[in-house]
Amino acid sequence: MSRVCQVTSKRPAVGNNRSHALNATRRRFLPNLHTHRFWVESENRFVTLRLTAKGMRIIDKKGIDAVLAEIRARGEKI
């Protein structure tokens, strides 16, 4: 399964580890992903999403129904 947030579409970023001597070695910055179940009252079922901590805060702010509508508008199947 890819490491992508279903709400924010955040993906791993690439950069460098920098040692004390400023040697650069490539590394990946991974998103803070969690698998979380949300109860959707309008559909009378649970929906499982793989999302970042920021994605959870967006759902708290907008509501699960609005966020699911945006995800489905992008063409993702839930």
Curated annotation (Swiss-Prot):
<dbReference type="GO" id="GO:0003735">
    <property type="term" value="F:structural constituent of ribosome"/>
</dbReference>
<dbReference type="GO" id="GO:0022625">
    <property type="term" value="C:cytosolic large ribosomal subunit"/>
</dbReference>
<dbReference type="Pfam" id="PF00830">
    <property type="entry name" value="Ribosomal_L28"/>
</dbReference>
<dbReference type="InterPro" id="IPR037147">
    <property type="entry name" value="Ribosomal_bL28_sf"/>
</dbReference>
<dbReference type="InterPro" id="IPR026569">
    <property type="entry name" value="Ribosomal_bL28"/>
</dbReference>
<dbReference type="InterPro" id="IPR034704">
    <property type="entry name" value="Ribosomal_bL28/bL31-like_sf"/>
</dbReference>
<keyword id="KW-0687">Ribonucleoprotein</keyword>
<dbReference type="GO" id="GO:0006412">
    <property type="term" value="P:translation"/>
</dbReference>
<dbReference type="InterPro" id="IPR001383">
    <property type="entry name" value="Ribosomal_bL28_bact-type"/>
</dbReference>
<comment type="similarity">
    <text>Belongs to the bacterial ribosomal protein bL28 family.</text>
</comment>
<feature type="region of interest" description="Disordered">
    <location>
        <begin position="1"/>
        <end position="20"/>
    </location>
</feature>
<protein>
    <recommendedName>
        <fullName>Large ribosomal subunit protein bL28</fullName>
    </recommendedName>
</protein>
<keyword id="KW-0689">Ribosomal protein</keyword>
